[in-house]
Amino acid sequence: MDGYDRRAPYDLNSRKINHPDFESVMSQRDTFNNVSSKQCMENQWIVIHPTRQTRMFKEILAGRLGYTDGQGIYNSVRSTETAIRQIQNTILTLSLDAVRYDDLKNDWIRHADMRGMSAKKLARTYGMHSEAEAVKVAENVFVTWRKTLQTTLINLARQLISCFTTANINTSSFSKYIDWICCLGIVPVVRHDRSARATSSIPTCAGRSTVFPNWAFHDASSRLRVVDSVMARGKQIVNYLSNSMSAVSILEYDRTLIEYNFFKRELRVKDILSGERGECIVIWRPVMNDGGVIFDSPMQRIYKEIIECHDLRQHATLCRLVNTAPVKVLIAKRDDGCKGVAGAQRVIDKVLGDQPENAASSAASRLVKLIIGLKGMRHVGDITDTVRDYLEETSGHLLDAASIDTSQPGFGQSNRAQSSTTEETRRNTIKIRDAFHSSVVTSINEMLEGYVNKLFNTVEGLKAANKDLLAKLCSKELELDRVRTEHLISKQAHTDMGNSQYSPTLETLARDLKHDVIDVGEVMDDDSYVANSFQSRYIPAYDVDLKRLSELWEQEMLRCFKLTRATNNQGHEVSISYSNSAITLLLAPYFFSVLNIYDIGPIVTNHEVYKSEEELCNSVFEKTRIHVYLDDLALIFNADVKRAIAKYFLVRNNSGRQREAEDLPDGHHGRRNDFHSPSSRRERYSRRSGYKRHRWNRESRRDYRRTQSTTNGEDDDGSQRD
């Protein structure tokens, strides 16, 4: 851990919470987001959060840009199980360490006297036959009391832990602490006065019998002196922890403003909504770079790879959208009788008349046929033939030669004086028809010639205008190519920088997508038929990149936070757990630097974190001083039992010696040379007993192996001293 930074002066008046309007808050946030780093550098302060990049850190952790298998390890990192186990360990350890030796000793003596299991009574009851039997009974008696005492104290301590859990202190969440470390390596906090924020959860908890049963406490307190000391210390610890955690608030990620002064190496933080100012706990110090900072955090290291993989997946999605859109070309094969001018004439006949005879005699039909014939011309000379055919067909309808007066000027002088005959009339009719045909053809040719000349002039003008437009188009195309190239270079630069915020979204790309128009009309003939054509589907593969990103997530989380992977015999992952190094790296700064809680007892180990609550309680009990006190009392009690048995045998042997001396004959007075014991064994035993009795009388005035300093002239087994 890097330690505390030098921070700006902290004003207590600035801690007052102000609630501005929502519109002003949003405008203020937009202002912060649009702040230029260069402008801030002039004031020696730069905004390092929120920025586009730091906001993306949190969105990536939330799975907005996708989710991989390796990213799931982060859930193991931000699990609160380790912090909960540490709090349980602290309450248990410090509460049980409050036991006093004198209280524990008095509780044991009281229990032994109430059950009639003192050392003297055990010696009299079980020691007359065998010392081993009495010692075994004594050991079982003490183990029974020891286990019941352990169960009682652990249950009371667990009730204290339950009370602390129901306090529901979420302002200093361990998960938010891990999120800040993973994103920025900095933890912004706001501290409050403990006196003003002190809230004791124990009285409230004690008033609810379902959570904190008072009857259990009073019952245990009436029988055991150690309960009072344990519960008193436990309440103090719970109050201390709850007040310490309530006095600290870890700020929310989306409502925090962090500024950095590179020259002073200072950080200052502010809550955008409430206006509160706090301090920053620097776990990993950021590095200055080109008007901004580079964070020493896992998200900073893998951010570029995540964005590139996300862009690749977006590109694949766009390719799937583009390449699955079919280009449909529908072509129909026509009948041979429907091709060309003949087919068009047949259609006209069907439209203008039901029968071919009626259609042929129709003036509209003949006129349409003339238009179709003119449209089907391939040469200029075809005009005369087409018009003549039309006139031949309609000569009886357009021109009535009998009604024409040939004597009028224009028909010649010879026709005026001659009488008309049938032959002459026929010849005149032919001449008139030929003259009419020639006049019509000449008029049409003159009209077409004028129209064509006019078209030629128009075409020449259009060619000149087209030439100018073509020059302008070429210049515009060159300019457009230049703009496209610059835009492509700029977009590629932003993509290389890993900033996907400048790239258009998938919806915009799909909307602005231009499809090439494929014209196949020139290669199609009358023999073509209907067909559907689809473009080939190409989608870039990103499985390898996705797998690499998953492995990168996994390696970064495991190595950065020192996690441990548990596998089975087949090598399959079973679980991801905290190692001892991870606990030291993450848990210790959380309690010491963030919460300012220093008296937490020993740090839990990785094996204790994943134990059940019952196993943890038993494990903690064996590490406290009460366990040592109980071992000492057990040793002393066994020694007292053995001593009481030895004394019992000594007293019994002395009484037997006195009875034998009374049975001796007169005159001997117990002299050694005059009296012989029935056996050598009896003689040796009597000598040892006499030596022990002499030694006991010599040291009777000493306070020898006194188990209770307040006893009035009594031995450890309760008998009155000599």
Swiss-Prot record:
Q: InterPro entries given for it? A: Herpes_Portal
Record-level GO BP terms: chromosome organization
Q: Where would you say this protein principally sits, based on its record?
A: virion
- Compositional bias of kind Polar residues: 404-422
Compositional bias of kind Basic and acidic residues: 658-683, 697-706
Specify where the region named Disordered lies, as residue ranges: 402-426, 658-722
**Which UniProt keywords are given for this protein, alphabetically ordered?**
Disulfide bond, Host nucleus, Viral genome packaging, Viral release from host cell, Virion
Report the sequence similarity comment from the record.
Answer: Belongs to the herpesviridae portal protein family.
The record's listing under HAMAP family reads:
HSV_PORTL (MF_04012)
Protein name listed in UniProt: Portal protein
Species this chain originates from: Gallid herpesvirus 2 (strain Chicken/Md5/ATCC VR-987) (GaHV-2)
The beginning of the lineage is: Viruses, Duplodnaviria, Heunggongvirae, Peploviricota, Herviviricetes
The gene from which this protein is expressed is: MDV018
